[in-house]
Regions:
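N-terminal accessory targeting/assembly segments
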Residues: 1-137
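Switch II of P-loop NTPase G domains
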Residues: 18-30, 50-53, 72-92, 278-301, ...
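Conserved C-terminal guanine-recognition region of P-loop GTPase G domains, centered on the G4
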Residues: 53-55, 91-100, 111-126, 269, ...
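Conserved nucleotide-binding/hydrolysis micro-motifs of P-loop NTPases
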Residues: 46-47, 71-72, 111-114, 133-137, ...
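C-terminal-of-GTPase-core extension/linker across diverse P-loop GTPases
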Residues: 3-38, 161-235, 241-242, 332-466
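Short alpha-helix plus adjacent loop in nuclease-associated cores
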Residues: 134-152
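Conserved beta-strand segments of the P-loop GTPase G domain that flank and frequently precede/overlap
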Residues: 41-44, 66-69, 107-109, 307-310, ...
Length: 466
């Protein structure tokens, strides 16, 4: 199916046939439900398609056939001209009874160049997605909030603009005929419209980013500390977030079910906040991921960063994903000083979904994690509630150091001791409390130094640090 791009102008409405799947520059609602669509997959060489096929499965798209061509990809059309023509001829024969009947999508197993996308679209006459466009369609399907929709729209428009520029370039050089009588001038008008929308969306995103930053500053001033969950997509971040905070988030065994950041409180403490955000994926162009910069900042600009890794992945995938996660974390810091001080940041690692692993398999995964710079990886299972108490204690120790013992002094004059105890509950996480014979209360608590100092200074001498 070809997609038509319509440029609305004051006195004319010329139509442009644009690369199928461009999506972002098409007027109206973009398609979000691709369940049941049929596609063919083009692959060069002996590339591993496991992750790509997982993304396709998440979309509900059915791969009718995978077509391989040996050797390096052709810079002009991904497949060689002859092989691409064979695919095109076969697509034209997809009548009733043909194995490709109902195919309306061609998938390319690469981050294709605009030239390759245009060439495959021209040859096949159906919608074409490369890896980036597959991800953008997946993002679009999962974007539920205004923040997420804005981010996805920016990423789609940036991708579409590169294709429009390629079309304009080919029209200028005579490689293709002009569109609708408008030629390059009309395409340039479309690109100008895209640029204007991008400018507007970025202003909206910048405003949202400033609001997020102000909320983070307010939380810091109030004495709250933040734990950010980071990791490869589908590593179990949202499941752990739900378990630790009790705050509802979408939890699915699907890639990229989370696109925006959700902040909630650690269930046992009002002063520890948890941030769950979008997962990473390997080989996603920086320009695309940059559209989600504000969302990522909410989790990465934290007091403690927790890197989560799916322990059920085969060893090779496990290593690839933890390497990709480290690479993306390093790339997301806002300035060079943060990157240089990365080793000084509070950071820990946890292996998730360990319930199906043997002791030997878990030991091997821990060894790999240690080689990547995490000396004491934890092992947890949200589903079977394995290791969660140790995980929480490790987080609190990283944030606050050792627990603090304080004494609340009983007195008949002034404020009640229960009132001061309530202040302690609001400021930290009480591990143990003991009522003494004279009415004093001994409390063991996780608490940061700022909150502790505020408690003592506001207690009129009724709170002592032991």
């Amino acid at each position: 199916m070809r997609m038509t791009l319509r440029l609305f102008m004051a006195k004319q409405e010329p139509n442009f046939e644009v690369l199928a799947g461009a999506g972002g520059v098409a007027l109206g609602e973009a398609r979000t439900n691709h369940e049941g669509r049929k596609a063919i997959l083009l692959i060069r060489g002996q590339e591993d398609t496991t992750e790509f096929e997982s993304l396709i499965k998440t979309m509900g798209i059915v791969i009718v056939e995978s077509i391989y061509q040996p050797g390096e990809q052709d810079p002009k059309g991904y497949f060689g001209k002859g092989r691409l023509q064979d695919v095109s001829d076969e697509l034209r024969l997809r009548v009733a009874g043909h194995p490709w009947q109902g195919v309306d999508l061609v998938l390319i197993h690469t981050n294709a160049t605009p030239r390759q996308l245009v060439a495959v679209s021209d040859a096949t006459k159906v919608e074409v997605w490369d890896r980036v466009r597959l991800l953008l369609s997946l993002f679009n399907a999962h974007a539920n909030s205004l923040e997420a929709r804005t981010q996805v729209r920016i990423a789609r428009l940036q991708s579409d603009r590169t294709v429009l520029r390629e079309l304009a370039n080919q029209t200028t050089t005579g490689e293709r005929a002009g569109y609708g009588g408008g030629g390059v001038t009309a395409l340039q008008a479309v690109i100008a419209n895209v640029n204007r929308e991008l400018t507007s969306l970025r202003k909206r995103q910048k405003k949202h980013s400033k609001a997020q930053a102000e909320r983070r500053r307010q939380r810091t001033r109030s004495g709250a500390v933040t734990v950010g969950f980071a990791g490869y997509t589908n590593a179990g971040k949202s499941s752990l977030f739900l378990k630790m905070s009790g705050k509802e988030v979408l939890v699915e065994d699907k890639l990229f079910s989370t696109l925006e950041t959700t902040v909630g409180r650690l269930a046992a403490s009002p002063r520890v906040l948890l941030a769950d955000t979008i997962g990473f994926i390997d080989n996603l162009p920086s320009a695309t991921l940059d559209a989600f910069r504000a969302t990522l900042s909410e989790a990465l600009e934290c007091d403690l960063l927790v890197v989560l890794v799916d322990a059920t992945d085969p060893v090779r995938e496990f290593e690839r994903k933890i390497s990709a996660t480290q690479r993306e974390i390093n790339a997301r810091y806002l300035n060079q000083d943060e990157l240089e001080n990365l080793d000084e940041r509070k950071i820990m690692c946890a292996l998730t979904k360990i319930e199906s692993l043997t002791t030997e398999q878990l030991a091997e995964k821990k060894s790999i994690v240690k080689r990547h710079g995490y000396p004491s990886p934890l092992a947890i299972s949200v589903h079977q509630e394995i290791g969660l108490e140790q995980f929480q204690d490790a987080m609190l120790k990283q944030l606050f150091g050792k627990t603090v013992t304080i004494k609340l002094l009983n007195s008949e004059a002034g404020r009640s001791i229960e009132g001061y105890l309530s202040d302690v509950y609001e400021s930290g996480m009480i591990i143990n409390k003991q009522l003494e014979k004279n009415g004093d209360i001994l409390v063991e608590v996780w608490i940061n130094q700022q909150s502790l100092a505020r408690l003592v200074s506001n207690s009129n001498g009724r709170i002592e640090v032991k």
